[in-house]
């Protein structure tokens, strides 16, 4: 029995070594250090209007209004090649396609400045941060979408819109929006808060389906839909408010719909 066990262990070790060798030989060569920080500017075809931004992984994005569409990427020189920026059907896609994260230091920048004058839709699947340097647009935007599919970074946008649509479906991203909107529609299903106290909305709808809170500043009419998990806090000076609780209160109910001031 001892001999059989020893032979089995030796077989396992041999199999493990073979699998590791196959894995290493099949992997494409990749630098194991980040390299010194460098900045690269990427230009795009002037004839293409970019209206949407999709970004992923650990990329930090700053939106800057400018007439010339371009991006500036700052990261380690050994990582730059695998920071991809592709344009398809009016959308810019930003991804970090570097491999072997576990072999590198995590202390490196991965910052992308997006210079634009036409982005009106953002799709966020990231653990990086998103912010605007000043207003996303000096002109009033007819419609703006912020869609958080999943993420855990900080989002901070200054907006001036006729209609604003915020949908947060999963993750722990903290969302802060400031500015003005004629109509704001917020859906919250994540484990953090949405702060729209400094976004003055004429009319608004706030719907929460998870833990966390929505803070909304509405002056005219607010529709607030909550459950017993999350809370909606609103400006008490709103002219009209309709409150709906979608689930019956539980014994340990924490969710409320009430003024924040």
Write out the residue ranges for each language-model feature.
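Short acidic/polar N-terminal linker immediately downstream of export determinants
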Residues: 11, 22, 26-79, 97-115, ...
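Extended, compositionally simple hydrophobic/Ser/Thr-rich segments
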Residues: 50-63, 112, 119-261
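Sec-dependent bacterial lipoprotein signal peptides
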Residues: 1-25
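Short carbohydrate-recognition loop motifs
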Residues: 91-97
């Amino acid at each position: 029995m001892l001999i059989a066990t020893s032979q089995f262990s030796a077989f396992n070790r041999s199999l493990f070594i073979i699998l590791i060798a196959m894995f290493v030989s099949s992997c494409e060569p990749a630098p194991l250090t980040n390299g010194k920080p460098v900045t690269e500017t990427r230009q795009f075809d002037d004839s293409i209007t970019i209206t949407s931004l999709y970004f992923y992984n650990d990329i930090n994005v700053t939106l800057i209004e400018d007439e010339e569409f371009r991006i500036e990427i700052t990261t380690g020189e050994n990582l730059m090649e695998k920071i991809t920026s592709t344009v398809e059907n009016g959308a810019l896609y930003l991804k970090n396609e570097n491999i072997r994260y576990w072999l590198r230091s995590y202390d490196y920048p991965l910052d992308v400045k997006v210079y634009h004058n036409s982005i009106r839709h953002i799709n966020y699947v990231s653990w990086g941060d998103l912010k605007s340097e000043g207003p996303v647009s000096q002109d009033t935007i007819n419609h703006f979408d912020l869609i958080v599919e999943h993420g855990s970074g900080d989002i901070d946008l200054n907006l001036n819109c006729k209609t604003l649509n915020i949908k947060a479906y999963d993750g722990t991203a903290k969302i802060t929006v400031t500015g003005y909107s004629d109509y704001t529609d917020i859906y919250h299903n994540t484990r953090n808060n949405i702060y729209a106290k400094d976004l003055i909305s004429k009319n608004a709808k706030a719907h929460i389906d998870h833990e966390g809170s929505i803070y909304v500043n509405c002056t005219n009419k607010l529709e607030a839909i909550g459950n017993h998990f999350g809370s909606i806090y609103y400006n008490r000076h709103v002219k009209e408010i309709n409150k709906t609780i979608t689930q019956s209160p539980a014994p340990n109910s924490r969710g409320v719909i009430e003024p924040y001031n």
